[in-house]
């Protein structure tokens, strides 16, 4: 399993980038913070602490929601 702090930081970084670019989004953490859901325009993407998350790639994908 990936480092939990790193996972949380990555989820929060993606969410922060969306907000900085004026994209209304939400974030929810579940399962003892081993899952996060980022919502943009009513669509959610689920991430788990086992995922290899690239912040720039995920931001670009969510930006298109």
Give the label of every model feature segment.
Residues 2-6, 60-65:
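Short acidic DE-rich linear segments
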Residues 10, 45-46, 64:
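Surface-exposed charge patches in extracellular/virion surface proteins
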Residues 2-22:
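Negatively charged, low-complexity tracts enriched in Asp/Glu with abundant Ser/Thr
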